[in-house]
From Swiss-Prot:
The lineage of its organism: Bacteria, Pseudomonadati, Pseudomonadota, Gammaproteobacteria, Pasteurellales. Keywords: Cytoplasm, Methyltransferase, rRNA processing, S-adenosyl-L-methionine, Transferase. Its EC number is 2.1.1.199. The gene is rsmH. Disulfide bonds: none annotated. It comes from Haemophilus influenzae (strain ATCC 51907 / DSM 11121 / KW20 / Rd). Its main location: cytoplasm. One of its GO terms (cellular component) is cytoplasm. This is Ribosomal RNA small subunit methyltransferase H. One of its GO terms (molecular function) is rRNA (cytosine-N4-)-methyltransferase activity.
Length: 321
C-alpha cells in the first residue's frame, strides 16, 4: 500500500477525509467510485489504501478537476469527465454494473472553485456571473438571469435557497435587467453587482450571514441541476453496488441532506406492510435494500477550526444488502 502523504493535495482541505473513506469499509482489492473528484483528496486517500489489484474510477464535470486528476499517474486510477448522475453509463461502459464496492460523493463546492473569482461562485470575490461547474455546457448565471421571470426566479430562490425574501430579491434582479434593456445600460454581469443588489433588496440583515448567501446557493443549485443530479444518482446507485457495497455521501445543506437521509431510510425499511399481519421476519424485510451504518457524522470542533467551510458538512453511510 502507498502512504497517504504521497498523495497530499495542496489546494483544498478535504472535508471529513478519514470518516468518508472509512465509511466505505475499503477492501484492498475492491472497485470504488469517487463521484466528485474535486481536487482529489478523497481519491488520493482511497488509492493509498488499495492494493495493486484495487481500482478507482473518479468522476467530475469541472474541467479543472479533470486537469488535476491527470496528474495522478497510477494504473489503478482513471478519471471520467462527466457528472456523477452518469455513473450508471460509466459502469455499463466498463462492465462494472453490480460490481462496485463503494461510491463516495462530496457534494460541496471545492475551495478552489470558491476562491477563483472567475468561476462566479462567491459573493465575497468580484468575478463574472457564471456559477457553472462545467463551464463548457449550459447557461451561465448571467445568461439565465437575463431571461428569467420574477415568478420563476422567486421559485428558485425559495425552493433551493429557502430565502424568506425571495420575491423581493427576484423583483430587484429582474427589474434591474429590464431597466438595462430599456436604457441601453449593462446587464447584471458581476458577482459583486448581484451581491450588492441583493443586499439592498433585503430589509433585515443577519449579522452572522451575508444577505446574498441563500440566493447565491439557490442560483448555483439551479444552474447546475444539483438536486436533479443527486436524485438521479440515488435512484440508480443500488444497481451499481455489489452486495455489501457502500454509499458514503457528504452533503452541505439541508436540501441535499434531506434527500440522502430520506433515500437511505426508505431503502432500509423494506416493504410497507400493515401492522398486525402474522408474517415472518424475512417476509417483513423483503425488498430491504440498504442497511444504514451508524449515525450521521459531522466534523469535529478541531476540523471546523482548521477548515471553517466544513462546519455544515454531514456524512451519511449505508450498505447494500
Amino acid at each position: 500500500m502507498n502512504s497517504e502523504n504521497s498523495f497530499s493535495s495542496s489546494e483544498h482541505i478535504t472535508v471529513l477525509l478519514h470518516e468518508a473513506v472509512n465509511g466505505l469499509a475499503l477492501k484492498e482489492n475492491g472497485i470504488y467510485i469517487d463521484g466528485t473528484f474535486g481536487r482529489g483528496g478523497h481519491s488520493r486517500f482511497i488509492l493509498s489504501q488499495l492494493s495493486s489489484n484495487g481500482r478507482l474510477i473518479a468522476v467530475d464535470r469541472d474541467p479543472r478537476a479533470i486537469a488535476e486528476a491527470h496528474k495522478i499517474q497510477d494504473l489503478r486510477f482513471q478519471i471520467e469527465h462527466n457528472s456523477f448522475s452518469h455513473i450508471p453509463e460509466i459502469c455499463d461502459k466498463l462492465n462494472l454494473v453490480g460490481k462496485i464496492d463503494g461510491i463516495l460523493l462530496d457534494l460541496g463546492v471545492s475551495s478552489p472553485q470558491l476562491d477563483e473569482a472567475e468561476r462566479g461562485f462567491s459573493f465575497m470575490k468580484d468575478g463574472p456571473l457564471d456559477m457553472r461547474m462545467d463551464t463548457t455546457q449550459g447557461l451561465s448565471a448571467e445568461e439565465w438571469l437575463k431571461q428569467v421571470s420574477i415568478e420563476d426566479l422567486t421559485w428558485v430562490l425559495k425552493t433551493f435557497g429557502e430565502e424568506r425574501f425571495a420575491k423581493r430579491i427576484a423583483t430587484a434582479i429582474v427589474d434591474f435587467n429590464k431597466s438595462a434593456v430599456k436604457n441601453g445600460t449593462e446587464f447584471l454581469s458581476r458577482t459583486s453587482q448581484l451581491a450588492e443588489l441583493i443586499s439592498q433588496a433585503v430589509p433585515f440583515k443577519d449579522k452572522h450571514k451575508h444577505p446574498a448567501t441563500r440566493s447565491f446557493q439557490a442560483i448555483r443549485i439551479f444552474i447546475n441541476s444539483e438536486l436533479d443530479e443527486l436524485e438521479s444518482l440515488l435512484n440508480s446507485a443500488l444497481d451499481m453496488l455489489a452486495p455489501e457495497g457502500r454509499l458514503s455521501i457528504i452533503s452541505f445543506h439541508s436540501l441535499e441532506d434531506r434527500m440522502v437521509k430520506h433515500f437511505m431510510k426508505k431503502q432500509s425499511k423494506g416493504e410497507d406492510i400493515p401492522k398486525g399481519l402474522p408474517l415472518r421476519e424475512d417476509q417483513i424485510q423483503r425488498n430491504q435494500k440498504l442497511r444504514i451504518i451508524g449515525k450521521a457524522i459531522q466534523p469535529s470542533d478541531a476540523e471546523i477550526q482548521a477548515n471553517p467551510r466544513s462546519r455544515s458538512a454531514i456524512l451519511r453511510v449505508a450498505e447494500r444488502i
